[in-house]
Amino acid sequence: MAFIEKGQEIDIEAIKAATQLSPEALRKKEARDRELAAIISGEDDRILLVMGPCSSDNEEAVLEYARRLADLQKKVADKIFIVMRVYTAKPRTNGDGYKGMIHQPNASEAPSLINGLQAVRQLHYRVITETGLTTADEMLYPSNLVLVDDLVSYHAVGARSVEDQEHRFVASGIDAPVGMKNPTSGNLGVMFNAIYAAQNKQTFLYHGQEVETSGNPLAHVILRGAMNEYGKNEPNFYYETLLNAINRYEIMGLENPFIIIDTNHDNSGKQYMEQIRIVRQALLNRDWNEKIKKTVRGFMIESYLADGRQNQPEIFGCSITDPCLGWENTVALVEEIYTTLTK
């Protein structure tokens, strides 16, 4: 039992230097970041869509998706604000399987962490600079935040990480919105405790230093469904669950109440077409209840170029992890959301 060094110490600053945003690109990104913060704080009433592939497995496919998404964003910008999922690190339930671009920059080849770090930076950089969109990623490894903190505009803490103290404390120091998912058990209390920790100042050791954070008032809820002890998914996007979550926000006195519904995972049972029905149901609930309308203002949607999933990266733009909506279904869903909001 041991840790075996497989390479020299990685120079993060050298990796970052190759993909620094130009002053003009940074200005555009910061403008979009201000819009995103205004949406989460309630100053801007547009709907937030965090959408894109389950995992960013192929740079060119992801960029083709990003170009199309940027065009779609322009058409719906008065009602909908889109942040693109560029998820480069994937949690694995038992440690096996594809762990994301950071581990495997080429999904058909052996893992290479040093090349993976460079590939992650390059992908976020290219999406931002070539399309004008801003990006979201999962903070699977808190120690890697320094790799992307200047590029990523939205961070998610996943269902398997939300109970971890380091994830919570690092989230409290991020100068960007952080979505906290409910754990796989579905326990909302765990998620709200994570949000409380993230919204408050914390002191801890990080990268070999004692640090104090400012607290992150933009930490918020992502409801992703649950898995019970029998392996059956239990959705939590329903009317009563939403009111329960809103009530917890009120009881705990947390800042900027904001709920995103993750339309895939255990809400859909990974039946990707169910994402359409889930969005429709949530929009109906918003119309029915003013509290829900005020608080449930975001959706996380998994979509790519091709419908479904594949075991090997053979079809261009088809997921190799969870199944996703293809492009035609994605456009139809976003246009339906827009039409509903316009009524």
Positions of PLM-derived features:
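Conserved, mostly hydrophobic/aromatic
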Residues: 52, 261, 326
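Glycine-rich phosphate/diphosphate-binding loops that line cofactor/substrate pockets in enzymes
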Residues: 37-45, 251-256
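Short acidic, Gly/Ser-rich segments with clustered Asp/Glu that frequently serve as metal-coordination loops
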Residues: 54-57, 256, 264-270
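N- or domain-start disorder-to-order transition segments that initiate the globular core
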Residues: 1-40
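Active-site-facing alpha/beta catalytic cores
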Residues: 66, 79-244, 248, 265-270, ...
